[in-house]
Curated annotation (Swiss-Prot):
It comes from Bacillus mycoides (strain KBAB4) (Bacillus weihenstephanensis). InterPro entries: DUF1444. This is UPF0354 protein BcerKBAB4_4524. It comes from the Bacteria. Belongs to the UPF0354 family.
């Protein structure tokens, strides 16, 4: 039997037939492209080269090429899955802005006390994304931010509730490494705002806790201040000992509000 590029194309398509892969044949260039149906990422196989190998090794040449294509496409799929695990992490503004190797991290300003970093999660651990890793991922900073916020919205949440002196405190502590990151879920914040009757105070003292409080009196402010300081001191990855009043999508550090209150009180007394 004489092997031709067209016959080789048919042989390879038989071995590479999967519902998640598409095959396209360019008869002019004698190239077979096998790509993922969803992402369109794939491999181009020059058929004359495979035919030449077949003349020497026969069926073994076809098996080797098919194996190479399969492994490459599977690796691409795994890489895409890992990219789907890009998540935001909250850190203090004093946290380093670059890796130990000197590569700047991808960051976004958040509040006066916090900054958003981005992590490539591999289930067991994660690595903060710096400019070097960004190039390897072949993503833009904007794409990383969009993917991270999208994935943050998919994180589940279940609060424990405690009421002290009329003030209600909601605690989120799943220990998945992203408890503080839930502060970026705007729909979560809006839903909590609707159920809160007093001031909505939010705190992320360390990586593994998110506190949302319904503060109705001054005692509540004292409690949240002490609570946040305690969690901050005990946290494995501390973020900030300050808490924030959340209103209309903005976070206002409570110490600033306290200063403003003192100024107002002083003017009234005068």
């Amino acid at each position: 039997m004489k092997m031709t590029s067209k016959k080789m194309k048919d042989e390879l398509m038989k071995k590479l037939s999967r519902p998640e892969w598409d095959c396209h044949y360019d008869s002019e260039k004698e190239v077979l492209r096998i790509e993922q149906t969803d992402s369109k990422k794939g491999i181009n196989v020059s058929l004359p080269g495979v035919v030449a190998k077949w003349e020497v090794n026969k069926e073994k040449a076809i098996e080797e090429v098919a194996y190479y294509v399969q492994e490459a496409l599977i690796a691409m799929h795994k890489e895409e899955n890992s990219m789907a695990k890009i998540l935001p992490v909250i850190r203090s503004t004093s946290f380093p802005k670059q890796s130990e190797e000197g590569n700047p991290f991808i960051m976004t300003d958040h509040t006066a006390e916090t900054r958003i970093y981005y992590a490539l999660d591999s289930n067991k651990t994660y690595r903060l994304i710096d400019e070097r890793l960004l190039q390897k991922l072949e993503l833009t900073e904007e794409q990383v931010r969009e993917m991270a916020l999208f994935n943050a919205r998919s994180l589940g949440y279940e609060f424990k509730q405690e009421t002290v002196a009329g003030n209600t405190f909601y605690f989120l502590n799943t220990n998945d490494g992203y408890d503080a990151s839930r502060i970026l879920n705007e729909s979560l914040l809006h839903s909590m705002r609707e159920k809160i009757s007093g001031d909505m105070v939010v705190a992320v003292p360390h990586q593994d806790v998110l506190i949302i409080a319904d503060i109705v009196n001054e005692i509540g402010y004292d409690i949240i201040a002490q609570m946040t300081m305690k969690f901050f001191a005990e946290g494995h990855v501390p973020i900030t000992s300050l808490s924030f009043v959340y209103e209309d999508g903005d976070f206002e550090p409570i110490f600033i509000l306290a200063k403003n209150r003192k100024k107002t009180d002083g003017k009234e007394k005068g």
